Amino acid sequence: MSTDIHPIDSRLSGMLKSDKVLKGIFNSIPCPSIIEMCGYAGFDFVVIDNEHGSADFQTTENMLRAARSSGITPIVRCFERDIPRVLDMGASGVQVPMVETPEQALRLSRMI
């Protein structure tokens, strides 16, 4: 039996540097099955919204597992305090809301 496993990787960086038009989806529904369907539907990435969405960390981790198993690159929209945790869970990247200055952006980029 062969299984296609998508470990934590650097696909996001490569995708952003390519000339390819990327297809992504923004999801705030705390349901791993939706993430899995997006992967099998051919989306390149998904942004899991933990700012406005109602997913707890356990559900977020399961959504990240669903992303990996279906081949979609997961990005988590989260607050600054949650960056280390969601990266440890397997997010390929983070989107941090309310970044208002270049200095703040630089400081956040150094956390990753």
Where are these regions (language model features)?
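Expand to "…catalyze enediolate/carbanion chemistry for C-C bond making/breaking, isomerization
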Residues: 1-112
